[in-house]
Amino acid sequence: MGRRPKKRGRDIHGVFLLDKPPGMSSNDIMQKVKRLFQANKAGHTGALDPLATGMLPICLGEATKFSQFLLDADKRYLVTAKLGERTDTSDAEGQLVQTRAVNVNLTEILTALPHFRGDLMQVPTMFSALKHQGKPLYEYARAGVTVQRQARPITIFELKFIDYNAPFLTLEVHCSKGTYIRTLIDDLGEHLGCGAHVVMLRRTAVSDYPAEKMLTWEALQQLAESADLSRLDALLLPTDSAVSKLPPLVLNEQQTKAVGFGQRIRFNNEENIYGQVRLFSAENLFLGVAEINKDNVIRPTRMVNRNNGTE
């Protein structure tokens, strides 16, 4: 008996900004969004903890080729920590491992914050998806095994005080890729001498995506039930929005054909643009991403497939 052919989704392309609900993993909610859009392909751009809410860009179709750019992008968070309690996961979903008195005033908090701004070295939490010998760290942690982790460079561009109503402290964080907010709060709690863990975490921004374009899962479901797929498709941001921080370069017809075949081309680099660029045709169609070297040669690195209706 032959295998049943795999059902193929729609060739739909773009980025959907989901306001992630609490209590679900990023992968689970991404799969639900994929099914709702009936998309052939989907990928998210950096997991949020199940406890967390907020901006989760979901790439559909050809946009998945550029998800790494959003993984590497700066992010902003609003976080509330509970002082005086430390957990094994550094958030409210973990087991309480230590309780201490909270003898911390606002002045001490404001004095501590500058220590956590700028370029830092952060040791990732054991409860993370980072791999060790092919296995996520959280699997070791759940088995009671602690793995030696190397500190990684991160940057906290902004750490802003919002509110302190003891024992709850609310901060706004603007950080580089790879920053664990749970670890930041745990480290701050140890610095203050009382311990702390995350009780609320909301991602408010990824790269320069507008927060007002986010839609909740409930709103998306309601729209899907009451309208056809074209209404859902209208919610998608263009594929090239994932690389909007790269300078644009418009190619002529001959150059467009060449890069479409993956060929390198030399050009008259009047604007002295070097490094990564996003390429467009003369008709303003997004072609993909390329690298321009010092010899003014364009080398295509990640191109969209223009045979499947990519916008």
Swiss-Prot record:
One GO BP annotation here? tRNA pseudouridine synthesis
User: Which Pfam families does the UniProt record give?
Assistant: TruB-C_2, TruB_C_2, TruB_N
Report the EC number(s), separated by commas if there are several: 5.4.99.25
Q: Which SUPFAM superfamilies match?
A: Pseudouridine synthase (SSF55120), PUA domain-like (SSF88697)
**Gene3D superfamilies associated with the record:** Pseudouridine synthase, PUA domain
One Gene Ontology molecular-function label:
RNA binding
Catalytic activity annotated for this protein?
uridine(55) in tRNA = pseudouridine(55) in tRNA
* Keyword set, alphabetical order: Isomerase, tRNA processing
Enzyme type, top EC level: isomerase
Under InterPro entries, the record lists: PsdUridine_synth_cat_dom_sf (IPR020103), PsdUridine_synth_N (IPR002501), PUA-like_sf (IPR015947), PUA_sf (IPR036974), tRNA_psdUridine_synth_TruB (IPR014780), tRNA_sdUridine_synth_fam1_C (IPR015240), TruB_C (IPR032819)
The catalytic site is made up of: 49 (nucleophile)
| Protein purpose | Responsible for synthesis of pseudouridine from uracil-55 in the psi GC loop of transfer RNAs.
Q: Member of which family?
A: Belongs to the pseudouridine synthase TruB family. Type 1 subfamily.
Q: Which PANTHER family match?
A: PSEUDOURIDYLATE SYNTHASE TRUB1, TRNA-PSEUDOURIDINE SYNTHASE
This protein's name: tRNA pseudouridine synthase B
In its UniProt entry, the species of origin is given as: Actinobacillus succinogenes (strain ATCC 55618 / DSM 22257 / CCUG 43843 / 130Z)
